């Protein structure tokens, strides 16, 4: 077993790439942040790793492993930068990607926009074959027609092929044979089968997910090869692990086969981190607020556990409207996008209202204040002009910000159209962003039958602590926990995530009279697969654990509720226990149950995980770094500039308190502490903020 002391976490965002290097011997943590290189994302990773090795003095062979999360998969889908992909499906069903379901995300809009399918119609082909809902063969696969379809797709320029036959999740026999034919006729094509990517009921969602996986897989595989080669070039011989969207990590080889499982990998690391930070501060109910350079996301953690979901959307045509994107059936941590990021561009609409996002300046050209060619105002430009960010101290002074360029962009695009001064224009952007995010977070909590003011906020991301207190006051929160290293929290979260993978198998059957022998076979097979995968990633067999979850519903419903099922209840065939677990989960979501209705099982999931790495936050800071007071800076509070103390975050020690207004800076982020708020440094070096009533 590799016992090298250093571990590295890397998160590629739309604007910055964040890195954390942890010494497992004494808990020392070193953070890094570099501009993302969109044309070749691995270049930013390698630059950041090179810098960390130099700063720590660590040898490359002293690095145990690198754990990596990235927006590459999501961005490839949003920006349509995958490879030309084909779809082979059951004859008569090739238009499923356009037909979708009967659900409309805007019922009354006759001109409602929907996402364009990733596969155009001329590369969607049907092949004669048919399985019945129970998986039995009604019509054998037409192999001659299958070969013709493969040749047609090659002629049409396809580089990857998704195969999605009707009811294949119940019996993969035809999809497996289709793969053999594809390998014979076109061995250079990437092949993805729906029975392997998402073996669940729901033809449209299954097809969409499989197509998305095929569309990005060649791009992602090439990226992983370049990154692995670059790391080995440094002498890093330890394995590369990838963060999944549900909070687990997997070996590089597994991630290469299932890139769609990484669609939310970066934000998932952030949620993992906030749970650790909150627990260190004694908080169990947490609002994770993650505001980076491109977007802001929120997630609720109840009693120390983040909720998971099997439904997600990407590439929405209407950013905040559910149902307007490409549906994915993948395990994800339940979170929502609630607003813009630091690089989001502000504008005035035709009604004279300030709008922010979704368009982002990203890292190239970036906000106007970066001096890299950006000329349109962003949230970061507004925060700089308001005095919340320091022009000379951004990224620890490694990157100087151009205040004049930010003022010019704000005045031209916001101030002039609205008749506002430059500071007023900056405040309009700041308030618009904060108001939108507060409203979205409150609605998200209400949809979960929760009160948002019952949570403590943990803000992370480079822009999170800048906006946290103002958003918290709008939400009526009393407590905000700001961790040390909040600006690189997602990368830190990767280091605390276990080796884990979720296996799913659809099997629709009534609970009454359920064939428990078949269920034991299904869950046993998935458990064995998971333990083999964990062992390949270095987890000892005795250290791997398995959880079983069942997705169930009342007969006749079109949605299901997931509940954790004790393995012993399956062993002894206890249908009453399964129903009790389902109804407890249903009651928690909807406040009622229907005892008279029969229950139907829809799918089963086994999550196999290794032990969770232990990260002791109390070891983060061995000694204070630098002096506490850095002087003052004019910052905007109460409608005017106020000379505000600027403090060094790394010089604050446990037990010390700061009264607002104050600007508390560290290399990767700044906490804006408004008048009336108090921040106390706790034993884990969190800043525990109490907001004014």
Regions found by a protein language model. Name each.
Residues 30-33, 58-103, 166-175, 198-212, ...:
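Short beta-strand-loop/turn "lid" adjacent to the catalytic site in phosphate-handling enzymes
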């Amino acid at each position: 077993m590799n016992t090298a002391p250093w571990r590295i976490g890397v998160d590629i965002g739309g604007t910055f790439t964040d890195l954390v290097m942890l010494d497992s011997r004494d808990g020392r943590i070193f953070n890094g942040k570099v501009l993302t290189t969109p044309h070749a994302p691995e270049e930013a990773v390698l630059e950041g790793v090179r810098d960390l090795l130099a700063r720590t003095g660590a040898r490359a062979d002293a690095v145990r492993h690198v754990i990596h999360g990235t927006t590459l998969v999501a961005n490839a889908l949003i920006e349509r930068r995958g490879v030309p992909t084909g779809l082979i499906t059951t004859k008569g069903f090739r238009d499923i990607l356009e037909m979708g379901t009967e659900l409309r995300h805007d019922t009354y809009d006759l001109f409602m926009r929907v996402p364009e399918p990733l596969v155009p119609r001329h590369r969607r082909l049907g092949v004669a074959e048919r399985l019945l809902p129970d998986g039995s063969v009604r019509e054998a696969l037409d192999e001659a027609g299958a070969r013709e379809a493969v040749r047609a797709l090659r002629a049409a320029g396809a580089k990857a092929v998704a195969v999605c036959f009707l009811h294949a999740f119940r019996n993969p026999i035809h999809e497996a044979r289709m793969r053999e034919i594809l390998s014979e006729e076109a061995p250079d094509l990437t092949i993805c089968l729906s029975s392997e990517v998402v073996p669940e009921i729901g033809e449209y969602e299954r097809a969409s997910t499989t197509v998305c996986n095929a569309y990005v897989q060649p791009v992602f595989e090439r990226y992983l090869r370049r990154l692995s080669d670059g790391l080995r070039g440094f002498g890093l011989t330890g394995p590369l692990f990838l963060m999944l969207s549900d909070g687990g990590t997997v070996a590089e080889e597994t991630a290469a086969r299932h890139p769609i499982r990484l669609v939310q990998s970066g934000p998932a690391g952030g949620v993992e981190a906030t749970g650790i930070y909150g627990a260190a501060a004694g908080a169990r109910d947490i609002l994770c607020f993650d505001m980076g350079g491109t977007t802001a996301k929120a997630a609720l953690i109840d009693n120390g556990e983040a909720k998971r979901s099997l439904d997600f959307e990407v590439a929405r045509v209407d950013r905040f409207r559910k149902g307007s994107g490409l549906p994915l059936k993948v395990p994800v941590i339940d979170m929502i996008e609630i607003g813009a990021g630091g690089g989001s561009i502000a504008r005035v609409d035709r009604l004279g209202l300030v709008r922010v996002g979704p368009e982002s300046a990203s890292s190239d050209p970036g906000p106007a204040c970066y001096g890299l060619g950006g000329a349109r105002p962003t949230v970061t430009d507004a925060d700089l002009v308001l005095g919340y960010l320091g022009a000379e101290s951004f990224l620890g002074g490694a990157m100087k910000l151009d205040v004049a360029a930010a003022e010019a962009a704000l005045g031209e695009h916001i101030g002039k159209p609205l008749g506002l001064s430059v500071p007023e224009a900056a405040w309009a952007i700041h308030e618009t962003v904060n108001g939108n995010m507060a409203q979205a977070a409150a609605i998200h909590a209400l949809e979960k039958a929760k009160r948002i003011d019952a949570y403590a906020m943990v803000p992370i991301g480079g822009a999170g602590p800048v906006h946290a207190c103002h958003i918290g006051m709008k939400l009526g929160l009393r407590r905000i926990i700001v961790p040390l290293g909040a600006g690189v929290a997602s990368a830190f979260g990767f280091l605390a995530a276990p080796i884990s993978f979720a296996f799913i198998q659809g099997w629709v059957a009534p609970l009454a009279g359920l064939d428990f022998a078949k269920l034991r076979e299904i869950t046993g097979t998935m458990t064995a697969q998971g333990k083999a995968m964990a062992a390949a990633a270095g987890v000892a067999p005795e250290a791997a654990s398995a959880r079983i979850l069942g997705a169930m519903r009342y007969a006749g419903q079109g949605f299901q509720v997931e509940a954790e099922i004790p393995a012993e209840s399956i062993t002894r065939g206890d249908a009453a226990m399964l129903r009790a677990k389902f109804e407890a989960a249903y009651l928690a979501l909807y406040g009622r149950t229907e005892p008279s209705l029969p229950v139907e099982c829809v799918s089963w999931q086994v999550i196999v995980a290794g032990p969770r790495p232990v990260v002791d936050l109390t070891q983060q800071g061995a000694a204070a770094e630098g002096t506490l007071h850095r002087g003052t800076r004019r910052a905007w509070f109460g409608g005017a500039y106020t000379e505000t103390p600027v403090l060094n975050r790394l010089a604050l020690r446990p037990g010390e308190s700061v009264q607002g207004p104050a600007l508390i800076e560290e290399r990767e982020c700044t906490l804006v502490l408004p008048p009336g708020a108090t921040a106390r440094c706790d034993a884990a070096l969190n800043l525990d903020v109490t907001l004014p009533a």
